[in-house]
Amino acid sequence: MTVGVLGSGTVGQDVLNLIQKRKHIFDDIGVNIEIAGVLVRDVQKKRNIPDGIRVTDTCDFLQECGVVIETMGGVDRPLEILHPYLRSHRSVITANKALLAERWDVLREYALDGNLYYEASVMAGTPVIGPMSTVLRASTFTRLQAVLNGTCNYILTQMEGGKEYAQALAEAQALGYAEDPPTLDVGGFDTAHKLTVMARFCADGNFPYSAVEVQGIEGLTLADIEDARKNGEKYKLVAELERHGSGWKATVAPKRLPETHALCTAGASRNALVYEGEECGTLIFAGGGAGGMITASAMVGDLLDYLLGFPGHVPLH
């Protein structure tokens, strides 16, 4: 099977190394993985990838590929590359929640056909998209709450220790946790992208990103954090989806939760999701929600599903 990779940042490099490391799982199903090429911006840059892999700044190798793994990030450029490829009835594996959330007008038909695999788009290697697209469909969805952004988790944890917001944010940026500018994270938009993706499995298969009400953590003060602590509570940036009249209400906002709440006890560096259904009851998912190798593990898992003949993650119709 010939595979193409778009992007060679941390995630792209880890995908390539994990495919090599886990070669035996592909051998077990009788498949030999050949990397046709890796699309990059700078071919001269040093990278931690297996020897012998073609690195290029052109997309001509896509014609050879049975499946493409997209790790570029962004919206316009990956869509420009992937749309013609998807039109040729071939499959794409991606972790790109912004692309999925914002350009569903283009991508939905390919997802409905089973040609989009995107487990890693929400909570990275902690599996939530797979269960939502399969086993949880048997249960009537009622509500979800989730903490989905590691940068906000880090900043709020530092503020609990007495650091001002600006200082905690600067540290997060210095450590590489937050982008510069960090609005996508601290403004709640990264979380809103992920909530939009999940909503299409449990509420409305055409749920629009524009329907999410978004408020970030920029306005929180040490006084807010301390007042919550005195009352046995913590602030978290919470994504929430629940029934509202005949439709659905989706929000992202800072919320005070009891310290014993599952979203608080999951750990400062972990994502968490509380999923509620009439028949399945309350389910809790928790684990790493960011990082190169954990994201790569979900993407390589999607590759294995593709090779085994399983369809991609099909939303509600």
Regions found by a protein language model. Give the residues of each.
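N-terminal Rossmann-fold NAD(P) dinucleotide-binding loop
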Residues: 12-13
